[in-house]
Curated annotation (Swiss-Prot):
[4Fe-4S] cluster 2 binds at residues 74, 104, 107, 110. Belongs to the complex I 23 kDa subunit family. Keywords: 4Fe-4S, Chloroplast, Iron, Iron-sulfur, Membrane, Metal-binding, NAD, NADP, Plastid, Plastoquinone, Quinone, Repeat, Thylakoid, Translocase. GO terms for biological process: photosynthesis, light reaction. It comes from Guardiola tulocarpus. PROSITE patterns: 4FE4S_FER_1 (PS00198), 4FE4S_FER_2 (PS51379). The gene is ndhI. The lineage of its organism: Eukaryota, Viridiplantae, Streptophyta, Embryophyta, Tracheophyta. NDH is composed of at least 16 different subunits, 5 of which are encoded in the nucleus. [4Fe-4S] cluster 1 binds at residues 64, 67, 70, 114. This is NAD(P)H-quinone oxidoreductase subunit I, chloroplastic.
């Protein structure tokens, strides 16, 4: 008779323990119910990127002195700089500059160490294509300024700031 009583006591303790675990999980679920959704309707809503966002690199051809500092500081030696030495003025003349964004890791070293500030990071992050060879940008494509999502009236912008609870 005693084994049956102890089994009923163990069953009761297990039931109470299971109810407590279910209650704890339910409390966590309820604590998340008051939060705003994290997901957005992407093509129609876009987050405003932060000030130091590392997007596509913008290149200004006129400022570049072909010093190749960007190539030396790049961890993967990515920028391709073609130049010609002008002997009469003893300066390098830039012929071609290109970056392959299929390989770029967007570390920002080239932008940080450029002595003439001809490189800068933009807020553009939509670089997907069907052909990987389209990701190889020359100086003309790098010089194109990105269209700001703030100026596009068909896209609703969402400011990504943490809420301050009062």
């Amino acid at each position: 008779m005693f084994p049956m009583v102890t089994e009923f006591m163990n069953y009761g303790q297990q039931t109470v323990r299971a109810a407590r675990y279910i209650g704890q999980g339910f409390m966590i679920t309820l604590s998340h119910a008051n939060r705003l959704p994290v997901t957005i309707q992407y093509p129609y809503e876009k987050l405003i990127t932060s000030e130091r966002f590392r997007g596509r690199i913008h290149f200004e051809f006129d400022k570049c002195i072909a010093c190749e500092v960007c190539v030396r500081v790049c961890p993967i030696d990515l920028p391709v700089v073609d130049w010609k030495l002008e002997t009469d003025i003893r300066k390098k003349r830039l012929l071609n500059y290109s970056i392959d964004f299929g390989i770029c890791i967007f570390c920002g070293n080239c932008v940080e160490y450029c002595p003439t500030n001809c490189l800068s990071m933009t807020e553009e992050y939509e670089l997907s294509t069907y052909d990987r060879h389209e990701l190889n940008y020359n100086q003309i494509a790098l010089g194109r300024l990105p269209m700001s999502i703030i100026d596009n009236y068909t896209i609703r912008t969402i400011l990504n700031l943490p809420e301050i609870k009062t």
